[in-house]
């Protein structure tokens, strides 16, 4: 076994707490001192009482000797006690200080134990990094940790046992220090979050009870540990699974431990996955094995121990419960069990599948001498880990690049001169065809073969986008391969940020490690045991750097920064180019300590590089070059060739084989293959030295830190983004894209938080930049993370129809297009009504903010309101085609956030959004703009947003981002969400019959006076004349005012007897003739003269009903001081009645405030033209002041708000807005009652 970090195990002896001190006898001097003082006090008192003393004249002097006597007594009594208490206090301080020092030692021991335990039993999720390394299969049968497997993390005893010395007797013990010792032992006797391991070789079956998903996750972690730590020659892993559960264990087939040592099928060694325990016993009966671990996931459990087999059963099913391990009669509950996902177990198994004990594969012969130069020899037998361990400090960062004419190896050493190297930074120049690309590949491959990824990482840059480094991308050493920068100018700035970010990251690591001065000191600290993250040398190779600087001259500042601080930060630079123009380096040449020059086009180019023309005189042989060190020495060399084919060893014999066939690879045994005649032999492609070595490097060492993450070329899928996202910190925070942060070397979700002041959204971008997709992504993200009871959407689609694709979501109440103006208007009206209703609700319930309401909603389902989003795709089109809605939307954006109503819109330019609305938008998503100068985020960065990349844009902080594609299935969301759904926008029918409204009302509502159907729920709506005694109907001509009066008259007759209701109909245009043919008719007036007479008698009746002074309160409450029917005065065409010459109805003005008590009801219909002015007429003004109901039918909006907050608007005949008070408005369709 590889030795891990050491951990102390010797017991720590803890000193016991001190005993309480005994009282010590005072010395003779101290005992005599009170006597002496007493004598002195008596002498003073005698002196005081002598004749002629001041005491004889002033008795107050007697107090002084008395005070001396009292002070003496007190001092004598308490002095000894203070000394005793002071001694105990000092003992306590000393002991507590001792515990403090001991605590530091114990804490260090616990930290070292943590490191040791995590090294011995690492997290199963990291096991794949150990495959192929020196620790793989390290545990041998004789070792103490053989078959000892981690199962989770928890509390473990401290490695150094705390042993307390002999405690003093309880009666003599100091309670303070004893309590401190007890707390110290309780706190440090165990360590938390330590790996918990159990032995599997216990002589009996092991069962794990609990939730099946968690149990299988724990078993996957245990199996992968067994496979990584133990050789397949010493431990085999079998599976006994039912057909129902076989899919959970299909990944076992990849483990070399699961291959039968003797039995074979058509695909090779038979996988040891069986259906029953008996089948497994029969299959292994003839096999002599040291250890077999069998996973049992069937209904066949508890059959006892099987000789030579360790069985681990999926035990009793307990849904939702954590796993519990039952082993040898002991039950171990796991509070934090290990879990390994199926895909992670599959990755681990497939990595192990490439390894066999003693397996060497095909034999390869060296290619062009490179393998011998590096010290590899046979590439097939090349073990990178072994070579890396054998590389000494001198050979670190030192690699052969070729040979001199006499065959001596030429070494390139990029260590500092202080370490006998050539320096960290260098230059490579060579003309086309000179072998420059091959030299760069040789250097990169040699560096990777000689140095572990923990020592060296590479960042490979090819400005022109050639194939120089493409094959190296898969090596563990390679932090990134960056190509094709010439065609993607924004990527150059991105690389500049990435390199600057890497310098910043390394500086921060050095500061955190104790303000170390260099990476060398950092690595030295790690070697001495400091727990620091790996910080390898970063070797940056830039090909065609001259072209890079010619197009982006500002990039030289990055090279200069690396040249200045790269030595201490461990960032080494190699610049390569076909030619070196004079003055191109601009001060960088002082940092280049070594130079390699291949064949050049001219002598001047050679002199620019080497100071001589020797490179121009080199032969035309590719790979011929010169190496110049910092001392000026020139070394001629011929580059090693790594791109040539790798010669194979000649086979000793050729055996005919059956033609290959495709077979499924499963855990079931495969049927044998019938060999057919051997046809022609297919030629096997010969790998190159480069590819063969790269194949051997894969899986060895940790992956390099990613300095360069892939650009945002392809938008992510929303489903994957939501799966990988961390839990939201706010109610309405959802990820909708990815933000690229090259300086931080990370990609972070573009999270939009709509729960606060940023609840309104604007997506702005040029045509075809993905605005509609961004809105759909926002809708789908919220719908996927919230049910329809929490978020709801109402969409106005004036773009290309993209929002119609979300109509199937349960969260979407309606989608209105250009051809649906009524639905669009109703949608705005409903949202405005929702805001008013919620405002009243918040006020009535003392809710001060929507955030507070969301907290209350989470605790109680009562009165649950969803956050409502008005989504508008195509703001400019809406302003042009539905200008009347703009003001309502602006008001909604300004007021709605306080009550959970949001606005999200898209526009082509920021200028399309007026400042009054733009100021209300807190979340701004800026895609590519037609003119980057219009950007409100970052005009310079807006120029770098690529064209023809829909979804690309800038985040709020000016970083590049891409919007995710909404790949979620709306039907699936509907199935998953189920209940509830967003209420649809109710649309009234063009006509509703009177009889159907009465039939629909039922018995309870049918007893009231019905008006028609209301839009919200499509239910009949009643007019309560008991609560609101008057009704005013306003509307244009032919809008249905008279039909509304006709319906009301018939409803009064239907719901009241003649003794309870009488109607006085004022109808100057004779439109209500014969509407009532019963005893309910109290009078029909068709002229002003007749009206005066009728009203005169009505006034007398009302005056008689006025309460007399002797009417009691009970009579007033019951309205019983008069009897008779209620009088309904129905006036059609009020504008014909109230003329300039006078208004006969003025006689009723004084009775209107008392109408409810007097049984008077005034129902007035008037045209809406001039209604804003007419409402100041005394009768109508009184009605409005009294809060009467109003039915606003079709009218002109320029009249303004007549009743409530609603303006008149064009409406179909028979339709109107019934206003009953502030915030209580509903659209109704008046029941159609045909004329007689």
Swiss-Prot record:
Its main location: membrane. Pfam families: FtsK_SpoIIIE. InterPro entries: AAA+_ATPase (IPR003593), EccCa-like_Actinobacteria (IPR023836), EccCb-like_Actinobacteria (IPR023837), FtsK/SpoIIIE/SftA (IPR050206), FtsK_dom (IPR002543), P-loop_NTPase (IPR027417). Gene3D superfamilies: P-loop containing nucleotide triphosphate hydrolases (3.40.50.300). Keywords: ATP-binding, Cell membrane, Membrane, Nucleotide-binding, Repeat, Transmembrane, Transmembrane helix. This is ESX-4 secretion system protein EccC4. GO terms for cellular component: plasma membrane. The keyword Transcription does not apply. Part of the ESX-4 / type VII secretion system (T7SS), which is composed of cytosolic and membrane components. It comes from the Bacteria. The chain crosses the membrane at residues 32-52, 59-79. Residues 407-607, 747-936, 1018-1201 form the FtsK domain.
